[in-house]
Amino acid sequence: MNRSYHVYALSDRIKAKRIEREIEKVDGVKKIRFSKDLKEMSIEMENSKITAVMERVVNICNRISYGCEVHYKFS
């Protein structure tokens, strides 16, 4: 399943790359990418692991970029 998220307070591309590398290692994640302006993140993941994946994603984002927040993007 592919889901999109709004990303707030991500300060630079270097931190975004670090976040991408760590999230790619999370069990259940197939693919991740940030938009060019770093305000949106798209994650392709297994349906059965959405909750566990997103708990890790939020922790990774906040640890690498202090104050970074991730919110589900409703279509």
Can you annotate each of these PLM segments?
Residues 12, 46-51:
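Helix N-cap motif at beta-to-alpha junctions
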Residues 13-17:
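Conserved redox-active cysteine motifs that mediate thiol-disulfide chemistry
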Residues 1-10:
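Short glycine-/aliphatic-rich beta-strand segments at the starts of folded cytosolic domains
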Residues 8, 42-46:
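Short hydrophobic/aromatic beta-strand micro-patches
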Residues 20-35, 67:
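Short acidic amphipathic segments
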Residues 18-23, 53-62:
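Short amphipathic alpha-helices in soluble, non-transmembrane regions
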Residues 36-42:
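Short glycine-rich, basic-tinged beta-strand/loop micro-motifs
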Residues 33, 62-75:
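Conserved short beta-strand edge segments in small beta-sheet-based binding/regulatory domains
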